[in-house]
Every structure is written in structure tokens, then in C-alpha cells.
Amino acid sequence: MSKTSKAYRAAAAKVDRTNLYTPLQAAKLAKETSSTKQDATVEVAIRLGVDPRKADQMVRGTVNLPHGTGKTARVAVFAVGEKADAAVAAGADVVGSDDLIERIQGGWLEFDAAIAAPDQMAKVGRIARVLGPRGLMPNPKTGTVTADVAKAVADIKGGKINFRVDKQANLHFVIGKASFDEKLLAENYGAAIDEVLRLKPSSSKGRYLKKITVSTTTGPGIPVDPSITRNFAGE
């Protein structure tokens, strides 16, 4: 939705920019301000009090949302033999090795997450420059380089999300769809915030959660009170 459109302006008028909403209030308002006919994705943006240029202040992690994302992720798996068979059985959308790498080198990127068996990483490194900037490069820290590829596929299909701080110290992640009940959105939000807090670098000084905004992909940003770190689904 264009920020100059009549529908967007009407939605934005419902948001009090001077107010800090509870996660539950923000989830409810996000649903109300989504005017698209499609089931919009609900997203969270966080400004962190870290310096991403410092290696010891890189915030990166994964979390299994208790109520899923509302979207079935398309998963690519780099594996051969029994691991490839296990990935297929677990529901992977595409499984391969050299053939899959060549396909990606040719421009194919129709997947949302990538998993690799450890013995495939030397090969996958050939497409790191393609996958890395898109947040698709398998990494042991996010559980996407693993011998148990079947579990990794099941986790991602079940609502596991990844997040990583960008160069501007922002985090972005999905907590569900506008069709979700606001309480479920708030509980997903809480699960993600819990993990972000757990990953706070010891070298980070001052306020860690500086600014939090909830919105749908087409709606206005709704400011959330960053001091709320428990009872996320409460009024």
C-alpha cells in the first residue's frame, strides 16, 4: 500500500505516534490497520543498542514461534544419500548437491530457507555470495548446518524463524499473519523477544531494546513499549 494512498492515510490515523502500545494492543491495531485484501504478514522491527561493526556485538539467532508464521516456508536442502532421503521425507521442497548449486548459480532462488549437511558446506561455499546477502546461507549457529537435516526441515516448516542484526543495528522478523488472533501474535512476539534478550551481548552498554515497531507489510508502524519484557499477551 502506498504511503500516500487514501487507505494508508486512514490506517495511519488510527495509530497514536506519541503512545507506546503493549504487544497485545499493537497486534490488535496491526490487524485493524491492514487494508489489503490478502492475508498480510505481521512484522517486527527492532532498533538495538549494539554496534554491529564489532564482532562481539553481532546479534543473530533463531526461535520457534509457538503458533508458527502462518506461512509454510519453502526449504532447500544440500544433501546426498540417506540425508537427502531424510530431507525429502521431512518435507523439503528441493534437495540436491552439485545440481542444486548449479541451479542457484543460474539464478533460481525460489526458497525461503536453506539447510546443508556438514559434508556439503565446502560445495555450498561456492554460492556464499549469492545466498549470504539474502540471509539464506546455511550456518551452524542457526541450526541450518546439521547432520540431522530432517529435524531442521521440520523446525523451519513448523514456524522457526531466523534473525540477524543489520549494519544499522536493526532486527526484522515475522510473527504471523493478520488473520491470527491478536493474543497468538502477542505470544509469538514474546517468544522472539525472549530470545533477542537472551542473546544480548555482554559488551552492549545502555539500553538494549531502543525502539520496537509492529506493522503489517502494507500498514503503518505501531510503536511498542520496549520495557515490556514479560506477560506479552496482557493488556
From Swiss-Prot:
GO terms for cellular component: large ribosomal subunit. The keyword Cell membrane does not apply. SUPFAM superfamilies: Ribosomal protein L1. One of its GO terms (molecular function) is rRNA binding. GO terms for biological process: regulation of translation; translation. Keywords: Repressor, Ribonucleoprotein, Ribosomal protein, RNA-binding, rRNA-binding, Translation regulation, tRNA-binding. The keyword tRNA-binding applies. InterPro entries: Ribosom_uL1_bac-type, Ribosomal_uL1, Ribosomal_uL1-like, Ribosomal_uL1/biogenesis, Ribosomal_uL1_3-a/b-sand, Ribosomal_uL1_CS. Pfam families: Ribosomal_L1. Part of the 50S ribosomal subunit. Binds directly to 23S rRNA. The L1 stalk is quite mobile in the ribosome, and is involved in E site tRNA release. PANTHER family: 54S RIBOSOMAL PROTEIN L1, MITOCHONDRIAL (PTHR36427), LARGE RIBOSOMAL SUBUNIT PROTEIN UL1M (PTHR36427:SF3). Belongs to the universal ribosomal protein uL1 family. HAMAP family: Ribosomal_uL1_B. This is Large ribosomal subunit protein uL1. It comes from Mycobacterium bovis (strain ATCC BAA-935 / AF2122/97).
